[in-house]
């Protein structure tokens, strides 16, 4: 009986290893300014409808303000502003992607969230300097069957906001 449970433990551990060793990741796809972007699902806590935001004095231009979610005060970063796109045509239809990056909780305001894609690391290309342009926040180009999506450096975006 003891050996059987040990064997079962080994099997379940190897399944976990097999699953984590698949060279795949899941990406939440969203749109800002008509363009498609992605964020690793491991950085996402939840996706919610926008809640009322309280403006804060002397905040960074990319920060819309803060809101309270289950007793936590969370800042809202407007990704359209970060990326230089015009404001959302229908802000009531926007979504908040609640993320946790380096133990900092933040809401990224996006215009829509479409789905989660499971992709392999081989589908992500490093952007060329030419295609990256002034958006140094872009760290990857995700090649999907019918479109491409940009992978942003969310930690860098937060770092830029906190430095200014």
Regions found by a protein language model. Give the residues of each.
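An acidic, low-aromatic, low-complexity terminal/linker signal
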Residues: 1-164
């Amino acid at each position: 009986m003891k050996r059987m449970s040990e064997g079962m433990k080994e099997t379940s551990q190897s399944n976990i290893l097999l699953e984590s060793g698949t060279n795949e990741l899941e990406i939440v796809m969203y749109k800002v300014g008509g363009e498609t972007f992605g964020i690793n699902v491991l950085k996402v806590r939840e996706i919610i409808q926008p809640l009322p935001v309280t403006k804060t004095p002397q905040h960074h231009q990319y920060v819309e303000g803060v809101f309270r979610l289950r007793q936590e005060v969370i800042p809202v970063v407007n990704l359209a502003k970060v990326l230089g796109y015009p404001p959302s045509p229908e802000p009531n239809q926007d979504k908040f992607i609640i993320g946790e990056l380096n133990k900092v909780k933040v809401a990224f305001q996006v215009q829509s969230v479409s789905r989660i894609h499971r992709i392999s690391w081989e589908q992500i290309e490093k952007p060329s300097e030419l295609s990256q342009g002034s958006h140094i926040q872009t760290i990857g180009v995700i090649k999907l069957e019918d479109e491409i999506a940009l992978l942003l450096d969310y930690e860098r975006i937060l770092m830029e906001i906190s430095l200014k």
